[in-house]
């Protein structure tokens, strides 16, 4: 009996037990979180157990070390070295294989000229034409069943000018090499194409060029490997539909990692990045975008190097892609369900998939059935007189306490915006923790103050029912969003799970009431908001509620003080006969026990049937009221808390560093943090008012620590730096001054850093900082001249870019006024791979340019061409982007045709000055090499000393990346 008493005491609904269960729940969630983030590091293949996988990993790691030895953007000579190394490795791997073929775009001189929407800004109305000379390396492995639709595996081998490209996208490239090596040994059933593509960083151009190759007709599916972060685990960033998500589920059995929340966030443009997957998807391919995604403040910086990644990260991407490609290559695929997918993994052990459309249907069923069942059970309990009526104050205290918590949270968020808006960049845990603890602490204080003055017998049950109503409203709203987005809001699934579990808990409570014992008469309100005698009695019992004397004896009708305190919520007998009797939730006294207490008024009425309850009936009642709360707790708290915590962590982990990219992103992250913390608090709010003083004291202490960290700690550190964008601009039309542009977030970060640079501190150099759009700040100053070329004479920067007009018939008397104007330009640019021409007319609202011709020069004189590529646009062309491979070819030969003003507006007017048909052409050419030297007059000098100075002297709390496709931009302008 003593053991039974101890067991029952441990499971009673009392403060200590509830607090302990909350501690256990959050401890388990924390351990699962750590397990999820660390487990992949322990799963490296061992040579004695998996020799083939171990060899693939070690070889891939060696390849990664070689290709990331230096910066290798498309605009650099190192880019060619990486291309040549990859080609050598591909030829080594394929060897004399009878089913392998290799195609090198550089050798075949493949180029494209096409009209392109800005891939990084879908809202842009800027009309762009791009010319690109490709050096993609393609490998075809002909399958045993070549009639099956083929699979493309793709990764890009270029980096940005400021990063070594270990994660972006070196690990993707070496994973492709490992996949190639594996499939050479294990011939696939379906044809595989490998695309080691170039120049993804500045236009997704390598992927675009793929569709100019005949092999593109063989492939229907794609696995794109990418890195939009700097290490960690490779996530299934997005996938085409439910069928492809299920293929991932069936194939990636070890360490699956994916969440459709990422997919929704990416498509909603909360992340200002893009991958080659966009191009493949737009061209009708279906597949998987597997990518590294964090941390963004190291992405595209010098810390995207092999020092900041690991074999564990490489193996996670390599093994994921290998499992997926091996499955797709060898199995027939069920691809019928093409609706968007909701998917997530459980700590890397299990992967779950459901169609977003199916989820919507289930939501509709939940929304329709749950209120019908709830209302039906309520009416039954009313009819059976087992429903206890409650005052309006009892019904409103939970929603009002929640509303008060949200209001206080909003006030606190205003303090964050005023004092430390970028705090999420350093550590999103502290602001989320502050929001979370503030909401639950506010609720605790308000509910307990209300209970002190106006005690309520059934607070937990009322709160659970009201939580059900709140979540029903939220689910209705999110289901509408899901439907209106054509089922593309795939990150809303956690709310469906939360609603389902909370509904079960609420229905169980209503079911217990409906099946409870019928009373002869209504027992009146249990939440006695008046009756001072009862209130004083209740207050005494509330004080006793925290005591834990397990040895206290019990008679057959009354329990110990802790027993009575444990009966707070579930006031329904589970017996098959006899009436239910009232139980005061927060005061621990039922009507049968009250008659033995001298504090109960002598004239107080009692139910005669209650007085006759048998010992067995009372025992059954105590069992139910002791343990039913545990079922409700286990339904509402652990699983929803874990899913919501994981969802908030997924969002913040991907977005917290985007606060550095503008004020809009800052407000987005703040809003996600606020809403996420409220959702995380909802599962425990129906119970939290009951925790003991130790728990609430720790909650208050955690809030104070979190709030202090959030408001007072500097947002940037060595490990979480502020990412700043650099470019050095030389405008030849305004002189040869080499103006340094440094772009970053507002907040007095940039200017103090720049003022401490030696070239500025010991000179009279002026720094001009101005606010630009979206909360960004641009600082400019005259920096040290770049040394882009090796020379034996004085470096003349004006010789870097020269523009020659070969032909222009604008003022020709032989041209009809209704005839388009034609001009030819020759750009002479030294050791260059990328230039941009922008067209503008001062007299026409839209660009009048309708046709562009690129003359491809091979071995002929600069004025001649072997091949021409022409593109036309009826809507006008604003910009021409040029990308060529040959550094020794120092010219771009361009033809431009534009409409005179007469053709665009039909207004024949005098043009005495002869300027109305003028076309302004702005030329910008880019150089991306900085970690190398030029030899000037026999002396080795750094190419971009202004950037070196920033790298060497800026605090470690800053990191640097390129603002444009080159670090040095030389500009000029002409009028045609």
From Swiss-Prot:
Disulfide bonds: none annotated. Residues 549-558 have a biased composition (Polar residues). Pfam families: Peptidase_M28, PFF1_C, PFF1_TM. It is found in: Vacuole membrane. The record marks 299 as: Transition state stabilizer. It is a multi-pass membrane protein. Glycans are attached at residues 96, 121, 189, 212, 217, 656, 768, 796, 811, 866, 937. One of its GO terms (cellular component) is vacuolar membrane. Residues 559-570 have a biased composition (Low complexity). Zn(2+) 2 binds at residues 168, 201, 300. The active site is at 200 (proton acceptor). It is an enzyme of class 3 (hydrolase). Binds 2 Zn(2+) ions per subunit. GO terms for molecular function: metal ion binding; metalloexopeptidase activity. Residues 528-610 are annotated as: Disordered. Residues 582-601 have a biased composition (Basic and acidic residues). Its EC number is 3.4.-.-. CDD domains: M28_Fxna_like (cd03875). Residues 37-359, 413-428, 483-496, 649-668, 714-976 are vacuolar. It comes from the Eukaryota. Zn(2+) 1 binds at residues 156, 168, 226. Belongs to the peptidase M28 family. This is Vacuolar membrane protease. It comes from Saccharomyces cerevisiae (strain YJM789).
């Amino acid at each position: 009996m003593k053991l039974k008493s101890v067991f029952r005491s441990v499971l009673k609904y009392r403060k200590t037990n509830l607090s302990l269960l909350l501690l256990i729940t959050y401890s388990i969630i924390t351990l699962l979180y750590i397990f999820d983030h660390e487990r992949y590091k322990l799963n490296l293949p061992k040579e004695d157990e998996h020799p083939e996988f171990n060899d693939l990993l070690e070889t891939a790691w060696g390849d990664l070390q070689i290709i990331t030895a230096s910066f290798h953007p498309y605009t650099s000579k190192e880019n060619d070295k990486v291309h040549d190394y990859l080609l050598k490795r591909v030829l080594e791997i394929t060897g004399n294989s009878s089913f392998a073929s290799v195609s090198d775009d550089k050798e075949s001189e493949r180029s494209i000229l096409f009209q392109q929407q800005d891939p990084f800004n879908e809202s842009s109305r800027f009309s762009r034409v791009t010319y690109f000379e490709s050096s993609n390396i393609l490998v075809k492995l002909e399958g045993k069943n070549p009639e099956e639709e083929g699979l493309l595996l793709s990764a890009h081998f270029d980096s940005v000018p400021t990063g070594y490209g270990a994660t972006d996208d070196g690990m993707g490239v070496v994973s492709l090499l490992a996949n190639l090596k594996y499939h050479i040994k294990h011939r696939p059933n379906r044809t595989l194409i490998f695309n080691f593509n170039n120049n993804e960083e500045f236009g997704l151009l390598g992927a675009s060029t793929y569709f100019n190759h005949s092999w593109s007709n063989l492939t229907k599916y794609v696995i794109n490997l990418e890195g939009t972060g700097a290490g960690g685990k490779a996530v299934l960033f997005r996938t085409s539909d439910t069928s492809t998500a299920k293929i991932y589920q069936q194939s990636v059995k070890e360490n699956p990692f994916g969440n459709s929340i990422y997919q929704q966030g990416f498509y909603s443009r909360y992340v200002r990045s893009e991958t080659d997957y966009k191009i493949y998807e737009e061209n009708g391919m279906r597949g998987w975008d597997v990518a590294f995604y964090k941390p963004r403040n190291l992405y595209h910086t010098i810390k995207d190097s092999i020092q900041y990644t690991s074999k564990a990260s490489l193996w996670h991407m390599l093994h994921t892609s290998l499992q997926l490609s091996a499955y797709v290559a060898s199995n027939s695929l069920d691809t019928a369900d093409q609706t968007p997918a909701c998917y997530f993994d459980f700590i890397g052990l299990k992967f779950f998939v459901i169609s977003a459309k199916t989820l919507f249907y289930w939501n509709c069923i939940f929304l329709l059935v749950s209120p019908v069942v709830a209302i039906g059970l309520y009416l039954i309990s009313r009819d059976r007189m087992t429903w206890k009526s409650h005052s309006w104050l009892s019904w409103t205290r939970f929603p009002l306490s929640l509303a008060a918590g949200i209001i206080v949270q909003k006030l606190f968020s205003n303090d964050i915006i005023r004092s430390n808006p970028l705090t999420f960049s350093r550590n999103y845990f502290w602001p989320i923790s502050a929001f979370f603890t503030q909401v639950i602490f506010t609720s605790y204080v308000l509910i307990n103050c209300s209970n002190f003055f106006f005690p309520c017998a059934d607070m937990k049950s009322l709160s659970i029912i009201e939580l059900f109503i709140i979540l029903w409203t939220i689910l209705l709203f999110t289901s509408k969003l899901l439907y209106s987005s054509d089922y593309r809001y795939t990150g809303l699934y956690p709310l469906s799970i939360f609603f389902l579990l909370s509904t079960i808990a609420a229905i169980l409570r209503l079911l217990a009431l409906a099946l409870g014992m019928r009373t002869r008469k209504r027992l009146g309100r249990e939440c006695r908001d008046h009756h001072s005698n009862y209130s004083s009695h209740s207050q005494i019992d509330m004080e006793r509620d925290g005591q834990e004397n397990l040895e206290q004896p019990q008679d057959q009708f009354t329990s110990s003080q802790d027993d009575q305190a444990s009966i707070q919520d579930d006031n329904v007998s589970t017996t098959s006969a006899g009436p239910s009797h009232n139980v005061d939730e927060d005061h621990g006294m039922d009507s049968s026990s009250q008659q033995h207490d001298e504090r109960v008024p002598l004239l107080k009425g009692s139910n005669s049937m209650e007085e006759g309850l048998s010992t067995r009936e009372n025992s059954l009642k105590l069992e139910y009221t002791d343990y039913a709360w545990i079922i409700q707790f286990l339904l509402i708290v652990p699983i929803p808390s874990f899913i919501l915590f994981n969802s908030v962590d997924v969002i913040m982990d991907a977005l917290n560093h985007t606060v550095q990219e503008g004020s809009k992103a800052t407000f987005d992250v703040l809003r996600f943090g606020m809403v996420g913390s409220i959702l995380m608090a909802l599962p425990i709010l129906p119970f939290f008012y009951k925790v003991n003083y130790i728990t609430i004291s720790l909650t208050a202490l955690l809030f104070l620590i979190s709030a202090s960290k959030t408001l007072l700690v500097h947002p940037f550190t060595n490990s979480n730096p502020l990412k700043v964008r650099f470019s050095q601009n030389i405008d030849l039309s305004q002189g040869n001054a080499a103006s340094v542009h440094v772009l970053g977030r507002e907040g007095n970060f940039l200017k103090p850093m720049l003022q401490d640079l030696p070239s500025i501190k010991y000179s009279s150099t002026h720094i001009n900082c101005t606010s630009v759009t979206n909360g960004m700040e641009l600082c400019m100053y005259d920096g040290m001249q770049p040394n882009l070329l090796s020379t034996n004479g004085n470096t003349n920067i004006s010789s870097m870019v020269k523009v020659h007009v070969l032909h222009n018939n604008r003022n020709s008397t032989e041209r009809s006024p209704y005839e388009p104007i034609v001009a030819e330009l020759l750009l002479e640019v030294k050791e260059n791979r990328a230039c941009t021409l922008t067209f503008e007319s001062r007299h026409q609202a839209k660009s009048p340019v309708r046709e562009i011709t690129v003359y491809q020069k091979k071995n002929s004189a600069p004025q001649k061409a072997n091949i021409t590529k022409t593109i036309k646009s009826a809507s006008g062309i604003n910009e021409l982007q040029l990308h060529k491979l040959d550094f020794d070819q120092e010219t771009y030969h361009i033809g431009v045709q534009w409409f005179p003003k007469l053709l665009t507006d039909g207004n024949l007017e005098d043009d005495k000055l002869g300027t109305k048909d003028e076309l302004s052409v702005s030329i910008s050419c880019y150089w991306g090499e900085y970690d190398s030297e030029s030899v000037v007059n026999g002396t080795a000098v750094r190419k971009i000393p202004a950037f070196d100075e920033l790298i060497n002297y800026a605090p470690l709390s800053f990191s640097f990346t390129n603002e444009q496709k080159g670090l040095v931009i030389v500009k000029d302008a002409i009028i045609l």
